[in-house]
Amino acid sequence: MRHRKSGRQLNRNSSHRQAMFRNMASSLVRHEVIKTTVAKAKELRRVVEPLITLAKSDSVANRRLAFARTRDAEVVGKLFNELGPRYQERPGGYTRILKCGLRTGDKAPMAYIELVGRPEAAEAVEEAAE
């Protein structure tokens, strides 16, 4: 029985799921917006938000924890040098999920997951307002 078990299986075994979310978290931190299915986006929140919270207090121990979870030194650098200071005053809620229709092959519901307050989005809004 699956009573009180949190998280989605997504038809993958645990090592595949862990590797997939590690790669997706790295892509989201690197590009600040990615397109994926709604279910994967909702699960990805549970991986990325604790990483950003960890990056808000910069220490060697926290950097090692972040590296252990992402296995990508470039991503760890961006987390602690850009994203941690950017979200220093925000108490959680670092991501936004925007639904964007259905995928053309299997009609899976798709969504963009993005980091809130990313600079490119702010510039686009200002240009549209002018």
Curated annotation (Swiss-Prot):
It holds the Pfam family Ribosomal_L17. PROSITE patterns: RIBOSOMAL_L17. Gene3D superfamilies: Ribosomal protein L17. GO terms for biological process: translation. One of its GO terms (cellular component) is cytosolic large ribosomal subunit. Keywords: Ribonucleoprotein, Ribosomal protein. InterPro entries: Ribosomal_bL17 (IPR000456), Ribosomal_bL17_CS (IPR047859), Ribosomal_bL17_sf (IPR036373). GO terms for molecular function: structural constituent of ribosome. Part of the 50S ribosomal subunit. Contacts protein L32. Belongs to the bacterial ribosomal protein bL17 family. This is Large ribosomal subunit protein bL17. The gene is rplQ.
